[in-house]
Amino acid sequence: MKIKALSKLKPEQGIWMNEVDMPELGHNDLLIKIKKTAICGTDVHIYNWDEWSQKTIPVPMVVGHEYVGEVVGIGQEVRGFQIGDRVSGEGHITCGHCRNCRGGRTHLCRNTIGVGVNRTGCFSEYLVIPAFNAFKIPDGISDDLASIFDPFGNAVHTALSFDLVGEDVLITGAGPIGIMAAAVAKHVGARHVVITDVNEYRLDLARKMGVTRAVNVAEQNLEDVMKELGMTEGFDVGLEMSGVPSAFSAMLKTMNHGGRIALLGIPPSSMAIDWNQVIFKGLVIKGIYGREMFETWYKMASLIQSGLDISPIITHHFKVDDFQKGFDIMRSGASGKVILDWQ
């Protein structure tokens, strides 16, 4: 049986709709009928066929890793799932054998394989993944929100790396993950949450999500904003989401002594760091990759169930046949999360 999919078919710019074989269900797998998928910044990198994509992505391959769907097939060894369960899933498939996997630190597996990056993705009518990677979506959480649990998890993992209650938080990079991290920080009790970017559309989106201040650093000085807020000592927690060297440099300068920084954005390997800021301020810097399995997933569901509203981050919906419009709007920068409807 052939099914519809969105694939990287050629080593050049673009994503194409094609037909692929129905995936085969293994003993430990679930077969998921896809309802909705969301376009990730990673998918845009793959579309653009940048240097990272050229080194990483096998061609041809079905792409995508943000989704919600319904369980329609269950491998014979699988327990804990039923036909009809609504699921999303962890996009990092881990080995189960390395020291970190065996120690319960699965998100630090050294042999991680990415859905839609190293193996067949979810931009397809059906997806097969290990049942271990599936997460049942609680009733009361919409399909739209469930489809963005993967990037929401990046935001939650990063934001909750440190205690935020009563703290002043700086977030550099107002992409969807940065904005969701800001909403999480406010929800769990941070005092001032300041987010910086140069994209006015996304700064407006951050304002709608409740940040204290959204600062266009091309037009406004971060130190001036801190004075206006009555901040005399610097930020307690920094969440770096942009990968932009100048943003990280500004963060280091404005951190309080003893401040803590979580890094999710991927800067160029040649990025220079003012180590005086790190050493003499006693800063703690932590790298973040993916989501904790599955603690972050339970926290995501609980945050939404306790009243966190991240729905404004979803700005566009398209039928899957109009996927090109979705990629165009994502590439323009004038969007939050873009959802493709497969049904």
Curated annotation (Swiss-Prot):
Cited Pfam families: ADH_N (PF08240), ADH_zinc_N (PF00107)
Residues at the site labelled Important for catalytic activity for the proton relay mechanism but does not participate directly in the coordination of zinc atom: 150
Record keywords: Cytoplasm, Metal-binding, NAD, Oxidoreductase, Zinc
GO MF assignments: L-threonine 3-dehydrogenase activity; zinc ion binding
PROSITE patterns: ADH_ZINC (PS00059)
Reaction equation(s) it catalyzes: L-threonine + NAD(+) = (2S)-2-amino-3-oxobutanoate + NADH + H(+)
Residues where Zn(2+) 2 binds: 95, 98, 101, 109
Positions that bind NAD(+): 177, 197, 202, 264-266, 288-289
Residues that bind Zn(2+) 1: 40, 65-66
Cofactors that this protein relies on: Zn(2+)
Assigned EC number: 1.1.1.103
Domain of life of the native organism: Bacteria
Cofactor note: Binds 2 Zn(2+) ions per subunit.
GO cellular component: cytoplasm
Keyword NAD recorded: yes
Main location: cytoplasm
Location in or out of the cell: Cytoplasm
One of the GO biological process terms: L-threonine catabolic process to glycine
Membership in a protein family: Belongs to the zinc-containing alcohol dehydrogenase family.
Function statement: Catalyzes the NAD(+)-dependent oxidation of L-threonine to 2-amino-3-ketobutyrate.
HAMAP family linked to this entry: Thr_dehydrog (MF_00627)
Quaternary state and interactors: Homotetramer.
Protein name: L-threonine 3-dehydrogenase
Encoding gene (name): tdh
